[in-house]
A protein has these predicted regions:
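Long, low-complexity, intrinsically disordered cytosolic termini of multi-pass membrane proteins
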Residues: 183, 187-198
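C-terminal transmembrane helical bundles of large multi-pass transporters
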Residues: 1-176, 198
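Short helical patches
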Residues: 172, 176-187
Length: 198
């Protein structure tokens, strides 16, 4: 058998710890979201855009010719927080509009129009905040460039996905829940219509 040691072993251990910590953080995040929403599905809708942010970060590394390393992973962790925040803002406003009496399709359209500007501003301020680091060419800054690329370009890609994915998944969930309720009512009506056997 063989194994890496020295300088190779430390990053491998750190990467394993980062992945385990990230999985725990996602579980805690899901729990914290499920409690106020009172739903097991809506937190998954909020977190569904996180993998797309990762895709944007990976492609940005390929486009810029930057190796994907440990600091890139740190950028993905920060990216997850921004993506979840944007999705949460959108879905919470959809629920508020729906609870005010609007049909779900109108609530989704209204939320997408009203919350588009805040979500876009959050994305642009995050990207512009790390952009000077992305274009910095000094030797001292090269250490942090992969993290800035992951966060900056990942949030740009994820925002586009959020504005399409979250409304679509919310509508699918609403339709599925409506069909489930109709079937339940039909079963209940059939059960009550059957004559009781003495």
């Amino acid at each position: 058998r063989y194994g890496f040691g020295g300088a190779q072993r430390d990053p491998a251990r750190a990467l394993g710890g980062l992945i385990r910590g990230f999985i725990r953080a996602l579980f805690v995040l899901y729990t914290l979201l499920a409690s106020p929403f009172g739903s097991y599905v809506e937190p998954l809708i909020i977190m569904a855009a996180v993998p797309f942010g990762f895709i944007g970060a990976v492609f940005s590394h390929l486009f810029m010719g930057i190796d994907f390393g440990m600091l890139s992973m740190f950028g993905l962790v920060g990216l997850s927080g921004v993506v979840v925040n944007d999705s949460l803002v959108l879905l919470d406003f959809v629920n508020a509009e729906h609870q005010s009496g609007k049909p779900m399709d109108e609530a989704i359209l209204s939320a997408a129009k009203i919350r588009f500007r805040p979500i876009l501003l959050t994305t642009l301020t995050t990207f512009l905040g790390v952009f000077p680091m992305i274009i910095e060419r000094s030797v001292q800054a090269q250490f942090l460039v992969p993290m800035a690329v992951s966060l900056g370009f990942g949030v740009l890609f994820a925002t586009v996905v959020i504005m399409v994915l979250v409304p679509a998944l919310t509508m699918l969930q609403h339709d599925a829940l409506g069909r489930f309720r109709v079937r339940k009512q039909r079963r209940e009506a059939i059960r009550q219509a059957k004559p009781e056997v003495a």
